Amino acid sequence: MIGLVGKKIGMTRIFTEEGTSIPVTVIELKENRITQVKNINTDLYCAIQVTTGIKKSNRLNKPQSGHFLKSGVTPGRGLWEFRTDKNNNFKIGQSITINIFNNVKKVDITGISKGKGFSGTVKRWNFHTQDATHGNSLSHRVPGSIGQNQTPGRVFKGKKMAGQLGNTRVTVQSLNIVRIDEHRNLLLVKGAVPGATGSDLIVKPAIKV
């Protein structure tokens, strides 16, 4: 299922005819250019590789320069892939625009969430705090026990503990499309999406309709 790579512009709100305020995220979806078409014979799977935006040639390393030169496509700010079926008719250099969402009501959006740094268990995992008084000394926000005793004699993998919060790949599913502005290449979706303003987002038609 193909989609588009865009940029998060920010959040605002729009009003319906009834006067209801709807919070929306504005996403800029400029044309995506196909740089490579992968197939079963050469790559063992079917996909298209796309780029968007413009990147100066002096900012590219040699592998990137060679890749864009071979495809004959203007260098973009990154490379992304979308899986396709065997009978796709995509060609290198072809452009994919915001028009693919004309008959779509909901989308799934993937991005890198805002990094919050090293965080404790209360902030990271919503742990309850311990008693503020009643004999509690310096243990108000500590996680408590992280295991048992000699059996099993280890801490289980995946144990919720303090660590880095955010800066991970996150997907928000089934966001309603509120408006599409084809002239300015803008997509307005209801609600919030992952990432900071200016970050890259992958927008696909929703899997769960």
Curated annotation (Swiss-Prot):
One of its GO terms (cellular component) is cytosolic large ribosomal subunit. SUPFAM superfamilies: Translation proteins. The keyword Nucleotide-binding does not apply. Keywords: Methylation, Ribonucleoprotein, Ribosomal protein, RNA-binding, rRNA-binding. InterPro entries: Ribosomal_uL3, Ribosomal_uL3_bac/org-type, Ribosomal_uL3_CS, Transl_B-barrel_sf. Methylated by PrmB. It holds the Pfam family Ribosomal_L3. GO terms for molecular function: rRNA binding; structural constituent of ribosome. The modification N5-methylglutamine is found at Q150. GO terms for biological process: translation. Belongs to the universal ribosomal protein uL3 family. One of the primary rRNA binding proteins, it binds directly near the 3'-end of the 23S rRNA, where it nucleates assembly of the 50S subunit. HAMAP family: Ribosomal_uL3_B. Part of the 50S ribosomal subunit. Forms a cluster with proteins L14 and L19. This is Large ribosomal subunit protein uL3. It comes from Buchnera aphidicola subsp. Acyrthosiphon pisum (strain APS). The lineage of its organism: Bacteria, Pseudomonadati, Pseudomonadota, Gammaproteobacteria, Enterobacterales. The gene is rplC.
